[in-house]
Amino acid sequence: MGRKVLVGLLVLVALGTIAISQRHKILIPLITTGAQIPQLVDASPVPGGQPFGDENHFSIVQLDEKTFAIAEPYSWARNVNYLILGDRRALLFDAGVGHYDIRPVVESLTDLPVTFMPSHFHYDHTGQGNWTKIAIVDLPHIRERADGNLLQPTWGEHLGDGEGIELPTWDVT
C-alpha cells in the first residue's frame, strides 16, 4: 500500500512538473482559436495622438524632434512602438502585432533607412518581422541559436500560434 502511494505521488509530481514547464503550450491552444483577435470597438484615447490610415488603427504622437510614439489604440495589446530618428538611420523599436502594417506610418514620418529592433520576441511586438534591417540585442544565448545571421524565436518566445501567426525567421544584421 505504501509503495503504491509513493509511486502515485511521484507520478503526480512528474505530471505537475511537466504541466508547469509546458503551461503555455497546453493553455494557449485551449483558450484560443488560432484566428486573429478582433480589434477593440472602443479605442484607448491617445493624448495628443494623430490618427493614421483609413481605419485609424495607428495613432502618432511626436515626443520630440526625433522621436515618435506610434500607438495601436484599437489593438487588444494596445502597443506603443517607437520611431527614433538619427542622422543617417532610423530605429523602429517594436512594430506591433502586424495585422496592420506599420511600414506606411514609418514611411510617412521619415525617408531615412529603418532598422527594426524588437524589445522582445513576442509576436505582438515583432510586427511579423519582415524588415530589411533587423537588429537584436547581441547576447551569447541568442547568438548560439543563430544559424549565421538567421534567427528564429522559439515557440515560447513568440507565442503567435494563438492567432495563427507562424514563427518567423529573421535575417539579423
Role assignments for model-derived ranges:
Residues 24-38:
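Ser/Thr/Pro/Gly-rich low-complexity linker/stalk segments immediately outside membranes or between
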Residues 21-27, 99-173:
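Active-site HxH/HxHxD metal-binding segment of metal-dependent hydrolases
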Residues 49-51:
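N-terminal helix-forming leader/targeting segments
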Residues 54-108:
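Conserved beta-strand hairpin/beta-sheet module of binuclear metal-dependent hydrolase folds
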Residues 39-45:
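Extreme N-terminal tail/first-helix region
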Residues 6-19:
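Hydrophobic membrane-insertion alpha-helices, especially the h-region
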Residues 41, 62-68, 165-172:
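Short Pro/Gly-enriched beta-strand edge/turn motifs at strand-loop
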Residues 1-4:
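Positively charged n-region of N-terminal signal peptides that target proteins for export
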